[in-house]
């Protein structure tokens, strides 16, 4: 799996219709109309997200690893 930073994941989510609801410290909280799911994306500069967290966020957002490319 490709290493992805929180910033890159946030851009992907916004392109897929997710909206930034609020910022709590370094965590950006995203939501989507018609969905109760909320995603907390840590934005720590260009530091890559850990694989387990990235997989979890992709699953919750109904995205696949192929969407990262």
What are these regions (language model features)?
Residues 1-24, 29:
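N-terminal first-folded block
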Residues 30-34:
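Active-site beta-strand termini and strand-to-loop segments that position acidic
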Residues 45-69:
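C-terminal structural segments of small proteins and small subunits
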Residues 35-39:
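Short, charged/polar, Gly/Pro-enriched secondary-structure boundary elements
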